[in-house]
Amino acid sequence: MVTKRVQRMMSAAAACIPLLLGSPTLYAQTSAVQQKLAALEKSSGGRLGVALIDTADNTQVLYRGDERFPMCSTSKVMAAAAVLKQSETQKQLLNQPVEIKPADLVNYNPIAEKHVNGTMTLAELSAAALQYSDNTAMNKLIAQLGGPGGVTAFARAIGDETFRLDRTEPTLNTAIPGDPRDTTTARAGADVASLRWVMRWAKPSGAVGDVAQRQYDRAAGIRAGLPTSWTVGDKTGSGDYGTTNDIAVIWPQGRAPLVLVTYFTQPQQNAESRRDVLASAARIIAEGL
């Protein structure tokens, strides 16, 4: 059975996936923010992509917003959204049991490994993928959608012409420079409906917001660069070439929600993750508001 908390999370999100909003305009101070982001990128030795959407007036800030970046585990948001969308017309879908076999386990399975030779529901798999970044759970969602192409097809159906998922976990994390597989852009990442249903329909104190907020502490990533009084729900991702990503919905005190996407990748395959770069990018954005 699906727990009440997970059921609320899934049903609320599934009922509320909206269409993409119109093209935003740019902040007047975008140039100054972009200069600071460029300086950060230069000092980091990698390539940085940033997109901010302020939902109060649909304005945005972009830095390398239309360049492709490997998504890594941030792609789990789109996969979970696609399953939630299916559940709109298949009312019992989220309660459907999925068998977990020993051969299903891959490189990171903190939840699925506890259910080997048993089952998990699609709701539980979605929660495991989003909250714990469980890679076996992600693969089960992908299988439910007919393979990576099914996730991409969902992206096209909601108006995202940029997102593409080509492989399963863990190979989707190879992040090879110039490889278009399993990539998107910061602009598309911020504007897709898979983030907008969280931002528009989940409150920071609600079930969806709760799951996102409990994923990671404030020690790294976007959260570390923002005021501690701001509520943040995010999904991180990392892979080869020091690829370090974080996508977030942010509820600042006294402001409408913000959607912030930060992607970072490096030229060396064995480079370390750089969540500090994402924190610095978030700090630059926050100071520019």
Swiss-Prot record:
NCBIfam families: bla_class_A. The keyword Signal applies. Substrate binds at residues 235-237. It catalyses: a beta-lactam + H2O = a substituted beta-amino acid. Residues 1-28 form the signal peptide. Hydrolyzes beta-lactam antibiotics such as penicillin G, carbenicillin, cephaloridine, cefoxitin, cefotaxime, ceftazidime, and aztreonam. Has especially increased relative hydrolysis rates for cephalothin, cephaloridine, cefotaxime and ceftizoxime. The gene is bla. Belongs to the class-A beta-lactamase family. This is Beta-lactamase Toho-2. The keyword Oxidoreductase does not apply. InterPro entries: Beta-lactam/transpept-like, Beta-lactam_cat, Beta-lactam_class-A, Beta-lactam_class-A_AS.
